[in-house]
């Protein structure tokens, strides 16, 4: 913790007021990053009229959750008690929003009637799946880039207007 306090240029006492342990600090930091990513995604789609365009933009920003901002914490997160529950909470919220956008796309007749929950689970889980250490080694690109490629393929495949 003293190394972290030194790097952040805050007192150790201040750091312990923020989080009582390194593990809690990491969980709080990742929680904040994921919350900010969600806020950014919602802000980006608020003025977009097409549900499918919203979905594309929302998932692109959501896939940033496995980008450089969180990469440095990957190994630590897998070891920290409570971290997976926090990640699951954010991922479940992400999947619910994707499901909602898919339902809106059906109502807007941008896509055919589909099992929106099944598709939402795939779109909302790709990035986390690709961020697993044993999977990262097999990818030709970063988890974020790979997740965006697959997400784009799926969304284009769903679209009634093939691009």
Question: What are the roles of these predicted feature ranges?
Answer:
Residues 1-24, 28:
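Helix-turn-helix
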Residues 4, 29-33, 37, 98:
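Generic hydrophobic, amphipathic alpha-helix propensity
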Residues 22, 47-48, 69, 161:
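Short coil/turn helix-boundary motifs
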Residues 28, 39-68, 119-123:
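Hydrophobic alpha-helical connector segments
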Residues 44, 70-77, 130, 134-137:
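Secondary-structure edge/capping motif, primarily at the C-terminal ends of alpha-helices
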Residues 57, 64, 96-108, 124-126, ...:
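C-terminal peripheral helix-coil segments that are non-catalytic and often amphipathic
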Residues 63-99:
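Short secondary-structure transition hinges
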